[in-house]
Design a protein with these regions (language model features):
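A short beta-strand-turn-helix
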Residues: 31-50, 79
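Short active-site neighborhood of thiol/selenol oxidoreductases, capturing the structured segment around
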Residues: 46-60, 85
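Thioredoxin-like thiol-disulfide oxidoreductase module
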Residues: 40, 73-119
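Bacterial Sec-dependent N-terminal signal peptides
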Residues: 1-25
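Second-shell loop/turn segments in exported
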Residues: 24-29, 102
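Detector for the c-type heme attachment site
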Residues: 63-67
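Extracytoplasmic/secreted cell-surface and envelope-processing proteins
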Residues: 60-62, 96
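Short Cys/His-rich "knuckle" micro-motifs
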Residues: 70
Length: 119
């Protein structure tokens, strides 16, 4: 009898937990993020500094900044006006070209960084 009650409670708990989870959509704040290639192209015709937010999928502080710092309307307006804002995943496996130099992830182990995130 106790096993049935425990099993039922466990199923209810897991069901409620699943309902409370997000759909996987990431909160990207109010900043108009673009990729690094687009930022470099735009910079050729309208020069502005490129602001690179380096993040990882597992970084709690990165997510906190997205919810708070980059969701501040005043700061987002300032960044969108005076910078080309780029989000860069530090663990990307893609080779990235920035300022005519190529950066790669040498895949040195678990959670290995792309060289652009290390400079």
């Amino acid at each position: 009898m106790q096993k049935k009650i425990f099993g039922s409670l466990l199923i209810i708990f897991l069901g409620l937990k699943a309902l409370g989870q997000t759909t996987g959509a990431e909160n990207l704040g109010l900043v108009n993020w673009i990729d690094i290639k687009t930022a470099q192209e735009l910079n050729k015709t309208n020069p502005k500094p490129i602001l690179i937010d380096v993040y990882t999928d597992w970084c709690g502080w990165c997510k906190h900044m997205m919810k708070t710092t980059f969701s501040d309307q005043g700061l987002a307006n300032y960044i969108n006006t005076y910078f080309y804002p780029v989000r860069f995943n530090a663990e990307t496996k893609d080779t990235v070209e920035f300022q005519e130099k190529k950066y790669a992830n040498k895949n040195t182990g678990n959670r290995s960084p792309n060289d652009l995130a290390v400079i």
